Amino acid sequence: MAVVTVPDKNLVLRDAEEIKNYLAAIGIDYERLESEPRISPDAAPEEILAAYAPEIEKLKATGGYATADVIDIKPETPNLDGMLQKFRPEHWHDEDEVRFIVKGHGRFHIAPKNGDVAAITMEAGDLIRVPRGTHHWFDLCEDRTVRAIRLFQDTAGWTPHYTSSGVEQKYS
């Protein structure tokens, strides 16, 4: 299950309901899907998408998402550090960022316009929706592994708009 940390308040949340409520208050949707995977997290991307098709179709219908894919990041990913340099600076998107973790761990930092930065450490079974325009950044956890289903409203996919604020340097 996710863990939410708010460093400036010295706050750590581990309870699913507290996490959901706290994140909702800063505009982030969080859900915990089944804890037992219905397919191997190492399955082919098309098998993962098929296994989670009911959830994907529901999200597409309610959020206007046009497409889904599977991102697979691991320590041996070619140019991993270069890839992470695109995710780590604070940025925002013209569309929602939706991620469902199927393997590994990742950490989203959310920088609300009128609130404290919150770090959401996610693991398999965690689903997050970061609304369009929300300032945030992402990094891997210690295992440097994450496999996630991503949903997009625009078939062109993930396009960041960097803020150049440097705020991420205080929290990384």
Language-model features: where?
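Double-stranded beta-helix
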Residues: 139-172
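Short, conserved beta-strand element in jelly-roll/cupin
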Residues: 92-112
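Structural signal for conserved beta-strand scaffold positions within catalytic alpha/beta enzyme cores
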Residues: 5, 32, 69-72, 150
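Conserved metal-binding segment of the jelly-roll/cupin
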Residues: 122-142
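N-terminal leader/capping segments at the start of a protein or of a new domain
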Residues: 1-65
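Conserved short histidine dyad/triad with adjacent acidic residue
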Residues: 70-94
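Short, surface-exposed beta-strand-loop junctions and turns on beta-sheet-rich folds
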Residues: 114-116, 144-145
